[in-house]
Amino acid sequence: MSTVDFGRVITAMVTPFHPDMSVNYTQAKKLSRYLVENGSDGLVVSGTTGESPTLNKDEKIQLFKAVVEEVGGQATVIAGTGSYDTASSIILTKEAEKVGCDGVMLVAPYYNKPSQEGLYQHFRTIAECTSLPVMLYNIPGRTGINVLPATVERLAKDVPNIVAIKEAAGDINQVSELRRILPEDFIIFSGDDSLTLPMLSLGCKGIVSVAAHIAGKQIQEMIDAFTSGNTTLAANLHKELFPIFKGLFITSNPVPVKAALNLKGLAVGGVRLPLVEATAKEIETVKNIMNNLHLL
């Protein structure tokens, strides 16, 4: 098992776009710097929040390079290299290693709905093509397939560089089973901001976060409070942050968080089709939540 330290607060970084919807690599560097200076221990580049399905391979590689150049060595840079195509994921994973990423995150294959054996073979085959540590990513609400705890247990046992999972099934029972059966040094991250504190109580490490774009320092404070034994403070911070945790999902992610970043003057641009811009009402909702929490 790898001793890699991904950190506790990892931001699933948005991908900035120019007005013509080309990738704004300069702004990606600026955003990565901002996030690291405001509570992020690491960054996932080209994950769900980074609109990976609408980025091509070359764009993803250039994003990996840009973020590594800006914050490599200061924060963990994790490349989102998973897809529904094992062969393509292998190619992208090798490129991520070449440009200096610290790890890769592999989302469960979406759309083609493999069996648990297919999931096992998919993840194992990709992981064996690289020396980088691998984080699995289970998000059945988007992929249509649930990576079951028994499958994760097999992978943890059989593939040394599969060292972590981002668990976003939204099921505390599943998290409990994962923590019960997995080795103690296998890292579990919450994939839902609103479940970070409950999952910490089950022995999970931290969060791969959307809200850390806006409230990274506050999320770090919540985790600090919990790990130091001040569970009352941690619970109070969780309750305080809960409106932003939920507010950033009033429509499809990353539409609200991009609106929030633009409100803060971070100029990340819009979203690529088939996603569409936040409505005026949605922007106002996000703005009000941010104002109430003094995040603007």
Swiss-Prot record:
Keyword Amino-acid biosynthesis: yes
CDD domains, alphabetized: DHDPS (cd00950)
UniProt subcellular location: Cytoplasm
Classification via InterPro entries: Aldolase_TIM (IPR013785), DapA (IPR005263), DapA-like (IPR002220), Schiff_base-form_aldolases_AS (IPR020625), Schiff_base-form_aldolases_CS (IPR020624)
Annotated GO MF terms: 4-hydroxy-tetrahydrodipicolinate synthase activity
PROSITE patterns documented for this protein: DHDPS_1 (PS00665), DHDPS_2 (PS00666)
Site (Part of a proton relay during catalysis): T48, Y111
UniProt GO cellular component terms: cytosol
Catalysed reactions, semicolon-separated: L-aspartate 4-semialdehyde + pyruvate = (2S,4S)-4-hydroxy-2,3,4,5-tetrahydrodipicolinate + H2O + H(+)
Keyword annotations from UniProtKB, A to Z: Amino-acid biosynthesis, Cytoplasm, Diaminopimelate biosynthesis, Lyase, Lysine biosynthesis, Schiff base
GO biological process: diaminopimelate biosynthetic process; lysine biosynthetic process via diaminopimelate
Gene3D superfamilies on file: Aldolase class I
PANTHER family given in the database record: 4-HYDROXY-2-OXOGLUTARATE ALDOLASE, MITOCHONDRIAL, DIHYDRODIPICOLINATE SYNTHASE
Subunit annotation: Homotetramer; dimer of dimers.
Similarity-based family: Belongs to the DapA family.
NCBIfam families recorded: dapA
Task performed by this protein: Catalyzes the condensation of (S)-aspartate-beta-semialdehyde [(S)-ASA] and pyruvate to 4-hydroxy-tetrahydrodipicolinate (HTPA).
Name of the molecule in the record: 4-hydroxy-tetrahydrodipicolinate synthase
UniProt organism field: Desulforamulus reducens (strain ATCC BAA-1160 / DSM 100696 / MI-1)
